[in-house]
Amino acid sequence: MTYQAVIGLEVHLQLNTRSKIFSACPADYHGAGPNEFTDPLTLGLPGTLPTLNRRAVELAMMFGLGLGCDVSGFTQFHRKNYFYPDAPKNFQLSQYDRPIARDGYLDVPGEGGPERIRIKRAHLEDDAGKLVHPTYAPYSLLDLNRAGSALIEMVTEADITGPEQARAFLESVQAIAQSLGVSDATPEEGKMRCDVNISIHKPGEPWGTKVEVKNLNSFRSVARAIEYEAARQAKVLDAGGIITQDTLGWDEGGQKTFLMRTKEGEADYRYFPEPDLPPLDITPEWIAEVRARMPELPAQKLERYRAAGVRESDAQTLSLSVSLSKFYDEALKSGSDTQKPDAQKLANWLLTDVAGALAAQEKGVEDSDLQPAHLAALVGLIDAGTISGKIAKDLLPDVLAGHDPAQLVQERGLSVVTDTGAIDAAIDAAMEADPATVEKVRGGNAKAMNALFGPVMKAMGGKAKPEVVRERLTAKLGL
C-alpha cells in the first residue's frame, strides 16, 4: 500500500551570545570540564532572578527576518513546567503564545524547481543541561554547562514530504544562521539540533497520528530517521495496527527509533507567564535597526552568482557555505579591472581541484594557507595563455601552501612555449621514434595520432598549448 509522509521539523539553534540568556554566566563552555560554567540562576537556587540578554533578542529578530518572518511587536516568556534532572529549575523559560517571529518561509531546491516550506514560528528559550550515561553504570551524570544557554527554536508547518527535502531545508537553515552570524549551527557540537514530527496517510485520506523523533544531531540522522519511521508506521498500519502519539528517540547504532515516552500535551506543561520578566515591546525602529545590520543572505548570494554566470549547482554550493562564498568573493574581486578571473572557471577550481586537495588534508579553505588572490592569479594565468591547465595543476600544491603562482612560473620557467620551431622539433622526434604509428595515421587511422601527441607534450614539459601541438602535428602528418 502506498502512503504519503507528512513531516514537520523543530530546529533548535544555540545563539552566539557571550553570556547565557537570563544571566551573566559565560556561555562559551565548549571544551570546558563538567559544571564549570554555572551560576546560581543556572542551578535554580532560590532567590535568583532572570535578566533578559539583549543580544539574544536581536539575534532572534535577525534570524526571523532572514526566514521572511514577521517580528512581533510584543512578546513575553512563559514557564514550561516539567521535572527532569537536566532542568534544575523544574521549568524552562520559553515563549508560549507570543513568539518573537512567525509566518515565514524558506524556498529549498527541488527536482522541479524551488519548493516552499512555511515557517510557523520562531521563539526564544533557555537550553537544558546534559545527561551523560556511562556504559553499564547504574547511574547518570549531569553537566549543567549548557543549561541556560540562549536557544532559538524554529517550527515549520507540516510541508515536508520526504528525507531529502528535509535535509535540503536544514542545510538552508544552517546557511542562513551562519551567514547572519546568529549561530555556528554545528550539529556535531550540539549547536544545531532537530526534532522530527512525522505521520503517514493514504492519498486522499486524513492525516495519520504523528509521532515525534527527538534530538537528532546530524542531517543524515534526520533523513534516516524519516525513512525508518515512515516505513515502520506503514508496516504497523498494513498489519491492522494503530499509531500512538509517542515521543521517540533515534538509535544511531541500530538505525532505528525507540520509545522514550508517551507524548505530552500542552496541558501537561502547565504554561503560565513568567512573573519575574516583564513583557517585551519591540518597536518598528528597533526592527529596522536590526535589519540594517544584516549581512547578505544565502538567497541573495545565489542570485548574484547566477547573474555572474556561475552554473546552478556551483552557485548553490557556494551560497550555502559561508567560508567558500567568502573566499570565492575575495578571489573574484582580487583581479584587476582589465583581468578579472572568469567566474565559472574560478568556481570550478575552487569547488573541484582546491576542495579535493584540501579534503585530502582534512582542511577547509578557512584552515589553509591558500590566498584568494593567488587562486585568482592561477586561473588568470591559464586564461591569459601563460600556462597550461596541466602546469596549473602541478603548481597547485605550492599555491595551497601560500606561494604566489606568478612568481613560481617565473622562477621555474614554466610559461607556455610559443616557439613553433621547438614544437616542430619535438614532433619530428616523436614521429622518428614511432614510424609505425605515423603509417597508421597516414593510412586513415586518425585516432592513432594520440599516440604521438602524448610524447610531444611530455617532451615540451607540458608547456606547449595542446591545441597548437595538435595543429602542428596534423600539418606534419599531412592530414
Swiss-Prot record:
Give any GO molecular function from the UniProt entry: asparaginyl-tRNA synthase (glutamine-hydrolyzing) activity
Q: Which GO terms describe its biological process?
A: glutaminyl-tRNAGln biosynthesis via transamidation; translation
Instruction: List the SUPFAM superfamilies.
Output: GatB/YqeY motif, Glutamine synthetase/guanido kinase
Write one Pfam family the protein is assigned to. GatB_Yqey
The answer to whether UniProt assigns keyword Nucleus to this entry is: no
Q: Which InterPro entries match?
A: Asn/Gln-tRNA_amidoTrfase_suB/E, Asn/Gln-tRNA_Trfase_suB/E_cat, Asn/Gln_amidotransferase, Asn/Gln_tRNA_amidoTrase-B-like, GatB, GatB_Yqey_C_2, Gln-tRNA_amidoTrfase_suB_CS, Gln_synth/guanido_kin_cat_dom
- The enzyme's main class, written as a single word, is ligase
Catalytic reaction equation(s): L-glutamyl-tRNA(Gln) + L-glutamine + ATP + H2O = L-glutaminyl-tRNA(Gln) + L-glutamate + ADP + phosphate + H(+); L-aspartyl-tRNA(Asn) + L-glutamine + ATP + H2O = L-asparaginyl-tRNA(Asn) + L-glutamate + ADP + phosphate + 2 H(+)
Q: Which domain of life is it from?
A: Bacteria
Q: What is its EC number?
A: 6.3.5.-
Q: Which UniProt keywords apply?
A: ATP-binding, Ligase, Nucleotide-binding, Protein biosynthesis
The function of this protein is:
Allows the formation of correctly charged Asn-tRNA(Asn) or Gln-tRNA(Gln) through the transamidation of misacylated Asp-tRNA(Asn) or Glu-tRNA(Gln) in organisms which lack either or both of asparaginyl-tRNA or glutaminyl-tRNA synthetases. The reaction takes place in the presence of glutamine and ATP through an activated phospho-Asp-tRNA(Asn) or phospho-Glu-tRNA(Gln).
Stored PANTHER family: GLUTAMYL-TRNA GLN AMIDOTRANSFERASE SUBUNIT B MITOCHONDRIAL AND PROKARYOTIC PET112-RELATED, GLUTAMYL-TRNA(GLN) AMIDOTRANSFERASE SUBUNIT B, MITOCHONDRIAL
Q: Which NCBIfam families match?
A: gatB, PRK05477.1-2, PRK05477.1-4
The record's comment on protein family reads: Belongs to the GatB/GatE family. GatB subfamily.
The record's note on quaternary structure and interaction partners says:
Heterotrimer of A, B and C subunits.
Recorded protein name is: Aspartyl/glutamyl-tRNA(Asn/Gln) amidotransferase subunit B
Species of the source: Deinococcus radiodurans (strain ATCC 13939 / DSM 20539 / JCM 16871 / CCUG 27074 / LMG 4051 / NBRC 15346 / NCIMB 9279 / VKM B-1422 / R1)
This protein's encoding gene: gatB
